[in-house]
């Protein structure tokens, strides 16, 4: 998967979530997550296995359940961090918990769909 970048802030009313990043659940491998903080921020990388595009059991975007990343480095973080997701969720995003700055998150997933 090509790297995908999303951001949230500055000037966002907190808490505020970034756009969602759809990961490739068919591909193996991990996903690297790089968060670049600018200014005063407190942020959390969140993951969800809910899928609004599921043809059988879709979950509305507003009803999705978001969980904090299993890596505590990117939970209530206040500085730039590098993390990885070893279990690939369907979606991830960055949540700006508080602050007046911004956070930019870039996600790159390794691996390809096995045949």
Residue ranges and their predicted role:
Residues 1-27:
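Transition segment at domain starts
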Residues 1-7, 45, 97, 101, ...:
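Viral virion structural and adsorption modules
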Residues 2-5, 52-65, 69:
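Surface-exposed loop/edge segments in extracytoplasmic proteins
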Residues 19-28, 64-115:
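Beta-sandwich interaction modules
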Residues 27-37:
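A short beta-strand element within beta-rich, extracytoplasmic domains
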Residues 34-36, 46, 95:
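Residue-level recognition of well-ordered beta-strand positions that form the cores
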Residues 37-39, 99:
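Short glycine/proline-centered coil/turn motifs in the loop regions
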Residues 40-60, 106-108:
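Short, surface-exposed beta-strand/strand-loop-strand elements in extracellular ectodomains
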């Amino acid at each position: 998967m090509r790297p995908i970048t999303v951001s949230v802030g500055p000037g966002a009313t907190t808490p505020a979530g970034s756009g969602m990043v759809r990961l490739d659940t068919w591909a193996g491998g991990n996903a690297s997550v790089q968060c670049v903080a600018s200014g005063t921020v407190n942020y959390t990388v969140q993951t969800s296995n809910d899928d609004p595009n599921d043809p059988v059991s879709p979950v509305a975007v507003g009803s999705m359940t978001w969980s904090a990343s299993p890596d505590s480095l990117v939970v209530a973080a206040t500085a730039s961090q590098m993390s990885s997701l070893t279990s690939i969720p369907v979606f991830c995003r960055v949540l700006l918990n508080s602050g007046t700055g911004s956070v930019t998150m870039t996600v790159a997933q390794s691996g390809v769909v096995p045949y």
